[in-house]
Amino acid sequence: MNQMNPAFVMPDVQSTVDTRQIPIQRVGVKAVRHPLTVRTESGDVQPTVGVWNLDVHLPADQKGTHMSRFVALLEESREPLTVERFRAMLASMLVRLEAEAGRIEVTFPYFVNKTAPVSGVQSLLDYEVTLAGESRNGETRLFLKVLVPVTSLCPCSKKISQYGAHNQRSHVTIDAELAADLPVEALIRIAEEEASCELWGLLKRPDEKFVTERAYENPKFVEDLVRDVAQRLDADERVVAYVLEAENFESIHNHSAYALIERDKRHAA
């Protein structure tokens, strides 16, 4: 059986010099599944599972990065995730990897306990959330992205029909660059309040009647939906820039209706 010589020093190959002199903008680990807890708007802690991407800039003269340090960072980051905690993780990663620039991104399911509009029955609804941060040239930028399922009802269908109108489930995706802490629930509310109607996980018959009539009284094209959400984001000082998308999974077509608005308030006229 081979035994390692106590005097033997294992070579650190990735720290050797690379003679090709080509920098790598982003190198790290991708699609790492790891449990985490998230601090909710009410202050509660919600357990979930995140899919993490972590990477750093690699100088031209360095052969490789230290891949194990990315996972070690996740293992040691057990505190509930907040925007400020995420910022601290990003700074810690740069120190650990001795890097001048880097990025962390995590996507996870986030659950909100919702109360049905008439019966009051409670149920959970899931949302896809992504928190991302990047640091470069001493500047750190943080991004919060939420995918919110809603209901949309077609104004044209309502106008031309003697009764009824076609409606469908839609996705509103808000990818916001943050100037200050912004709860996930705040972005969810903006999307839901500007849709024809929001969704619930569990509805009784009186609730279903409410949802049907609410959507009928509040018809919106996909263009209306993105413009109304954009107005809300424009008025929120916690958001400095955003990419906003809406996709209607049309119930009378085998394709979707789609709209996008992108705006950086720092460069707005």
Curated annotation (Swiss-Prot):
Q: Report which superkingdom the organism of origin falls in.
A: Bacteria
**Which catalytic reaction applies to this protein?**
GTP + H2O = 7,8-dihydroneopterin 3'-triphosphate + formate + H(+)
- UniProt EC number: 3.5.4.16
Q: Name one GO biological process term.
A: tetrahydrofolate biosynthetic process
Site positions for May be catalytically important, renumbered to this chain?
A: 154
Kindly indicate where the leader peptide sits in this chain. none
EC category? hydrolase
* GO terms of molecular function: GTP cyclohydrolase I activity
**Keywords, in A-Z order:** Hydrolase
Quick one: which pathway? Answer: Cofactor biosynthesis; 7,8-dihydroneopterin triphosphate biosynthesis; 7,8-dihydroneopterin triphosphate from GTP: step 1/1
Q: Which Pfam families match?
A: GCHY-1 (PF02649)
The similarity annotation says: Belongs to the GTP cyclohydrolase IV family.
Q: Which PANTHER family match?
A: GTP CYCLOHYDROLASE MPTA
Function summary: Converts GTP to 7,8-dihydroneopterin triphosphate.
Its recorded name reads GTP cyclohydrolase FolE2
Origin species, per record, is Burkholderia ambifaria (strain MC40-6)
Question: What is the gene name?
Answer: folE2
